[in-house]
Amino acid sequence: MRTLKLIILLILSTFKTINSTNIKISECGKARCVPNGESSTDGGQCGLPLPGVIGTAALNVFAFDKGSRCGECYELTGPLGSTVVMITDGCDAGDACQQKELFNFIISKKDFNKIGNSSAYGNIYSLGYQKVSCGFSGYIKAVFGGGSIAGRPDYSYYFHVSFSNFNIGIKQVQLMGTGMSRISTLKRDLGKYTWNQEGGGAKLQFPATLILTGIDGQTLSYKFNKPPSGQMIDIKKQFAPPTQKSSSALVLRESEKKCEMGKLPDYVYQESLGLGWVTYFSWKFDYINLESHETNKKASMGKKLIQVELKGYGGLHFTREGGFQTKYIKSLSFTIRAAPPISALQVYVGQVGSYTLPTLGWQWTEITIPASKIKSKNDIEYSLSFYNNKNQTNTLWIDNIKWNFTPDCPPTPAFVTDKFI
């Protein structure tokens, strides 16, 4: 008897451990992240209960996709670590919320400070992100609602349901009522799924069955009688983590993989300053023109370049909010010329460096510097500098500032793909 109890406890303990793990269910991607004050106090546009054990996030309009990602969980990786958040809301104010190039996560300052430093910067432009299972314990919860007659629920013609505490995102919800000739697919409305009687169609009668399809193709069925309106009901079902239902080596590899920060965009500057880069912290200069047209009609140049006049011991300092990973940088290349000639121009990544370029003059010179000569020993850095280490004023023209990466640099696309086979 004692042995049986121990076995049961072991099984329950294992089940709890599995559910509390955030299984990786997509490839790694690159995104942007900003802090937004205190933690959310409601369920946002999705209308979901707050998860409590993890933080919440809002997504830009494109990524939120009319609520299709409500309740999904993502692991976010910044310069100081990782945290898991659940999508509960969308944002539509400002350029970051309206752009379609990247996922833009808006999270609480508390969660932001788990992965970055909100006192030092207000964005992480090289965020790593990955879809994960939410790791909730227990089963999926449902809240029903719809029409009413004389103050009593009547779902004959109109019916809606919302779900919470699901570990895998919900792709589709279907309904089959008693007497119905076919299954009806419910329409998603943010965090709710609605059914309306079509003209001449059958009324909803009970018992009925809901069929939930997860983003990985899993299906759960829940048979129920007429439910009370507005009350949370435990459906006694839960999506299984991918590794519990699949022997695919690819899925297993993805579930073990931890994402790093997102890969840097190739260019710091090409026709314009790359997203996330600023020159605010440059020092001892007379001017910085990021849209100079003084290309001298060189074939490899575009229409614009950087023109800067540095005083003696002045620096052109490119800063990237939220930092960037240096691990996979192979080299830095750019095109440059100077007037008067300069033999003391240093280039370095991070706060200090000592690599000095060959003497530069009026003719355009294409430079490639191995990363080992300019980067620090830190895995994460925040800046790139061109430093005039001499007491004379120089004008520099610089274009096509580009990072080159090692062959083993993992790709981090802007939009991740679920890894289910």
Curated annotation (Swiss-Prot):
Q: Which Gene3D superfamilies does the UniProt entry name for this protein? A: Expansin, cellulose-binding-like domain, RlpA-like domain
Q: Which residues form the Expansin-like EG45 domain?
A: 43-139
SS bond list: 46-70, 73-134
Kindly indicate where the leader peptide sits in this chain. 1-20
Top-rank lineage group of the source organism: Eukaryota
Where found in the cell? Answer: Secreted
**Keywords of the record:** Disulfide bond, Glycoprotein, Secreted, Signal
Q: Which GO terms describe its cellular component?
A: extracellular region
Q: Which residues are glycosylated?
A: 19, 117, 391
SUPFAM superfamilies named in the record: Barwin-like endoglucanases
> Which family, according to the similarity comment?
Belongs to the expansin family. Expansin A subfamily.
Q: What does this protein do?
A: May serve to lubricate the movement of the cellulose microfibrils during cell growth and wall extension and/or may serve to maintain the fluid state of the slug cell wall.
What is the protein's name according to its record?
Answer: Expansin-like protein DDB_G0293186
**Source organism (scientific name):** Dictyostelium discoideum
